[in-house]
Amino acid sequence: CKPPGSPCRVSSYNCCSSCKSYNKKCG
């Protein structure tokens, strides 16, 4: 999974925690 702070898309679940919609980053 992607570590916190990594860029992500809210529609994908590849973060270790969750993708934050306000900054489009994990964690």
UniProtKB/Swiss-Prot annotation:
Top-rank taxon, per record: Eukaryota
Assigned GO CC terms: extracellular region; host cell presynaptic membrane
GO molecular function term, any single one: ion channel inhibitor activity
Disulfide partners: 1-16, 8-19, 15-26
Record-listed 4-hydroxyproline modification sites: 4, 7
Keywords: Calcium channel impairing toxin, Disulfide bond, Hydroxylation, Ion channel impairing toxin, Knottin, Neurotoxin, Presynaptic neurotoxin, Secreted, Toxin, Voltage-gated calcium channel impairing toxin
Similarity-based family: Belongs to the conotoxin O1 superfamily.
Protein name per Swiss-Prot or TrEMBL: Omega-conotoxin RVIA
Organism: Conus radiatus
Lineage per the UniProt record: Eukaryota, Metazoa, Spiralia, Lophotrochozoa, Mollusca
